[in-house]
């Protein structure tokens, strides 16, 4: 290459001039100088053979070079008969393996309709760029990339010039610093990096996507490794059909993508010491779907002992898209498309193994909105039970966990109904909520109540007619349900027994054309700051106009993340110090990130004005956690008829409503039965059973009579039940007080006449045994009926095959009636006093 690029053009003249001779001499000198200054290629030994990497300088004077080992195999190729099977250890090799090029990515297809609602903004806005990272996919794709920091002479020199009294400078200048020492102002023992000259912490990144696409090759871990003095690892794992197909039985159990991640962690645990890493300080982190994978890994016994800490960015195992509860349905659809739909699942899987990977991944199988077609499944092994049950049992308490969300995660959920200039109309708002309820909760009897209550909660009544306000609240609705509530519940369950937990809310994003100007920090906006992209400038995937504030915030985030990987505490050992960017101190130097606990719920607001706050969106979290599950089952608990709003009979034939997606695709949903806005039969918009179904929603302003009637009915019902319960208890107590007066005296030996005067009803009440109920059922025609005491049995999410399942958030203790309803702990779905570390009984759950 040098001969092609650096050799000057020489003339064939027999008598070269002095100038040409001088150029030739200078060229040879430059070659010698380049060869003498070029660092030798790093090599490292592993249990499977030797690797040769490359030392790569970074385009920043504060960042030292990084040794990169790309395309390191961590498992045997899952090809042929090994397709749809757990991974196996990689084969050994002889000689030195060249690890200087990215490996092939796992087979995937981003040219069909991708589920944009689950993908980060920087991914969906740059699909053409993303396509360049997934060219020439191959089933032989189970490789990882290792980024190892080296000595940073330039950064040390700059730090010593700025602070000559630092220990590393007093010991003999920058040249005396050992590889691995941090540049923090560690004059005090409390600021010392506990492993300065020893083994480095390891951070393993699980890429996101939608379980259908993605690769670790898209994320460069060099800046994070160099700045944070940690070893960063990215990896590929099987995605889509090849990674998560499941028949629901032993023929194809599924979860191969998760098993790939576990095998990668096993390889790291056994080999990272050769790279200078500490196998006792391995942190797994990810964003979006990657965060859901991390959350699931903390619940699996297969990953025990393979890592110690987890950073969960904008995701949770409790999100609706984290687990696939209908794997057989989508496997059958795939088998139909490729001609493998046979009754015997073993034969079906054998047939699918004979198909090419390209044929399988190119099949366009669209899941229900807010769900996944191919993803992790509850198989009784890798994921032994429902994630919320596992969290209740404390399966993840041995890990230190840091987790959080971005301010406007739900941007992609509303982009299709948003006018960039005018906001969201009232009709679009109503339709979005109705579609949300249909896709997540199906068509329960109490769907109208649930829908109207959600709209009530997410209407800004002080500015209800402002389209921009509707747009903001609609983004908040999806953000709260899909990200905030699952993350807060995860944090509560992890922290309630004292396990180290840290929570954050990310409120900053770079300026770019990838999303609207009105948007907040959207899904995936924290990723460039975690990996230090602002320090090296815009990239093809992150074409932002980074400012000094962006560089400062990226340095802050990397310090927090790497501190947590080092000690389990984001505040130490390295203090926040970005004076090499700004001459004045940043606000983070005065902020101490407090631990999270279920009572105070302290979290760090990460933005240009950082602060520690408490109870992040507590009202909305309580709404989704406690009220919505009861509203969903409202029809089963009691029946009532609204007296203020005319409700049409339920529409048993749901017509199909086609909606254009932002990317040009269409998706079909069933039209919900909408209550009319006005009860006047003569009004233009009134409902008429003889008329054909009109538009989905009326354009006229609504008077919210339905919401008012629902609120009044629910409140009155609860009040009435409380009065009945109180009256029953008072009646029983009064009877017990009067019972001694009615019993015969021993001296008199009589008393039968007194008892005989009591009515038969009172006599029966006095003779009730302890197994009877205090309140018997009323006449069958009563609107409200008091039944037996509630049976709090853990109800899993189940649904018919033709409607999507409920979200993981709807696992709740559902009473059979409202009588005797026990008070639930604010952070627990079990009744107060129940030991949540174990299930209520061995038969209280049913595997979906």
Curated annotation (Swiss-Prot):
* A Pfam cross-reference name: COesterase
* Protein name (record): Neuroligin-3
Q: Where is the composition biased (Polar residues)?
A: 645-656, 677-689
Task: Write out the topological domains of type Extracellular.
Answer: 38-709
Per the annotation, which location comes first and is thus the protein's main one? Answer: membrane
Give the Phosphoserine positions (modified residues): 745
In its keyword annotation, does this UniProt entry include Oxidoreductase? no
Assembly: Homodimer, and heterodimer with NLGN1 and NLGN2. Interacts with neurexins NRXN1, NRXN2 and NRXN3. Interaction with neurexins is mediated by heparan sulfate glycan modification on neurexin. Interacts (via its C-terminus) with DLG4/PSD-95 (via PDZ domain 3).
Q: Which GO terms describe its molecular function?
A: cell adhesion molecule binding; neurexin family protein binding; scaffold protein binding; signaling receptor activity
Biological processes per GO annotation: adult behavior; axon extension; chemical synaptic transmission; circadian sleep/wake cycle; excitatory postsynaptic potential; inhibitory postsynaptic potential; learning; long-term synaptic potentiation
Query: What organism is recorded for this protein?
Result: Rattus norvegicus (Rat)
Gene this protein is translated from: Nlgn3
Q: Subcellular location, in the record's words?
A: Cell membrane; Synapse
Q: Family assignment? A: Belongs to the type-B carboxylesterase/lipase family.
């Amino acid at each position: 290459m040098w001969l092609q690029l650096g050799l000057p053009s020489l003339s064939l003249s027999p008598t070269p001039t002095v100038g040409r001779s001088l150029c030739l001499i200078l060229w040879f000198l430059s070659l010698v100088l380049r060869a003498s200054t070029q660092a030798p290629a790093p090599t490292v030994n592993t249990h499977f053979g030797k690797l040769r990497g490359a030392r790569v300088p970074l385009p920043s004077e504060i960042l030292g070079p990084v040794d990169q080992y790309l395309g390191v195999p961590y498992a045997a190729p899952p090809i042929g008969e090994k397709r749809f099977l757990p991974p196996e250890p990689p084969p050994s090799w002889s000689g030195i393996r060249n690890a200087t090029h990215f490996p092939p990515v796992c087979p995937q297809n981003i040219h069909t309709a991708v589920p944009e609602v689950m993908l980060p903004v920087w991914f969906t806005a740059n699909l053409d760029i993303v396509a360049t990272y997934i060219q020439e996919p191959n089933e032989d794709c189970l490789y990882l990339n290792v980024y190892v920091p080296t000595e940073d002479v330039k950064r040390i020199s700059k730090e010593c010039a700025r602070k000559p009294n630092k220990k590393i400078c007093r010991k003999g200048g920058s040249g005396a610093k050992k590889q691995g020492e941090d540049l923090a102002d560690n004059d005090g023992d409390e600021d010392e990096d506990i492993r300065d000259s020893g083994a480095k912490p390891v951070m393993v990144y699980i890429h996101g996507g939608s379980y259908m696409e993605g690769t670790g090759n898209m994320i460069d871990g060099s800046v994070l490794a160099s700045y944070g003095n940690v070893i960063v690892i990215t990896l590929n794992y099987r995605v889509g059909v090849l990674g998560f197909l499941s028949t629901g039985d032993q023929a194809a159990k599924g979860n191969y993508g998760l098993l790939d991640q576990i095998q990668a962690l096993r390889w790291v645990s056994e080999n990272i010491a050769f790279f200078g890493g500490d196998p006792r300080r391995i942190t797994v982190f990810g964003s979006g779907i990657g965060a859901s994978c991390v959350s699931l890994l903390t619940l699996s016994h297969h990953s025990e002992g393979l890592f110690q800490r987890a950073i969960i960015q904008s995701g949770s195992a409790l999100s609706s898209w984290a687990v696939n509860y209908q794997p057989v349905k989508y496997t059958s659809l795939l088998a139909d498309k490729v001609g493998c739909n046979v009754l015997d699942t073993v034969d079906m899987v054998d047939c699918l193994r004979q198909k090419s990977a390209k044929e399988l991944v190119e099949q366009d199988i669209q899941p229900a909105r807010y769900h996944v077609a191919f993803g992790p499944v509850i198989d009784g092994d890798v994921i032994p039970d429902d994630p919320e049950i596992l969290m209740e049992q404390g399966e993840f308490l041995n890990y230190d966990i840091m987790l959080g969300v971005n301010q406007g995660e739900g941007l992609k959920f509303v982009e299709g109904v948003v006018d960039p200039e005018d906001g969201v109309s009232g009709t679009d708002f109503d339709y979005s909520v109705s579609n949300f309820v249909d896709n997540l909760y199906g068509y329960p009897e109490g769907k109208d109540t649930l829908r109207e209550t959600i709209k009530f909660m997410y209407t800004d009544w002080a500015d209800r007619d402002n389209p921009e306000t509707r747009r903001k609240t609609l983004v908040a609705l999806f953000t709260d349900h899909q990200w905030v509530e699952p993350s807060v519940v995860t944090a509560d369950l992890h922290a309630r027994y004292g396990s180290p937990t840290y929570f954050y809310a990310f409120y900053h994003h770079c300026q770019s054309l990838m999303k609207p100007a009105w948007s907040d920090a959207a899904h995936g906006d924290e990723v460039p700051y975690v990996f230090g992209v602002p320090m090296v400038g815009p990239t093809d995937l992150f074409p932002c106009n980074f400012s000094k504030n962006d560089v400062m915030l990226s340095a802050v985030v990397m310090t927090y993340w790497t501190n947590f990987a080092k000690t389990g505490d984001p505040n130490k050992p390295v203090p926040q110090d970005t004076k090499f960017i700004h001459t004045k101190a940043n606000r983070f130097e005065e902020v101490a990130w407090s631990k999270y606990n279920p009572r105070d719920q302290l979290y760090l607001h990460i933005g240009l004005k950082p602060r520690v706050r408490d109870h992040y969106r507590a009202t909305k979290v309580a709404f989704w956690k406690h009220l919505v599950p009861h509203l969903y089952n409202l029809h089963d608990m009691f029946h009532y008829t609204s007296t203020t709003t005319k409700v049409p009979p339920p529409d048993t034939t749901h017509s199909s409503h086609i909606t254009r997606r932002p990317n040009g695709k269409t998706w079909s949903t069933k039209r919900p039965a909408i209550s009319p806005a006005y009860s006047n039969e003569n009004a233009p918009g009134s409902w008429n059973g003889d008329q054909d179904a009109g538009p989905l929603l009326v354009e006229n302003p609504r008077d919210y009579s339905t919401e008012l009637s629902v609120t009044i009915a629910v409140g009155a019902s609860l009040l009435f039940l409380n009065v009945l319960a109180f009256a029953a208890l008072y009646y029983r107590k009064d009877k017990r007080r009067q019972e001694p007066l009615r019993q015969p005296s021993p001296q008199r030996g009589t008393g039968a006449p007194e008892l005989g005067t009591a009515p038969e009803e009172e006599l029966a009440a006095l003779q009730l045994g302890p197994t009877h109920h205090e309140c018997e059922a009323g006449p069958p025609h009563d609107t409200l009926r008091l039944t037996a005491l509630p049976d709090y049995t853990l109800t899993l999410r189940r649904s018919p095959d033709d409607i999507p399942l409920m979200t993981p958030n709807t696992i709740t203790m559902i009473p059979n009636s409202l009588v005797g309803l026990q008070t639930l702990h604010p952070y627990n779905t079990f009744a107060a006093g129940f030991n949540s570390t174990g299930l209520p009984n061995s038969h209280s759950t049913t595997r979906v």
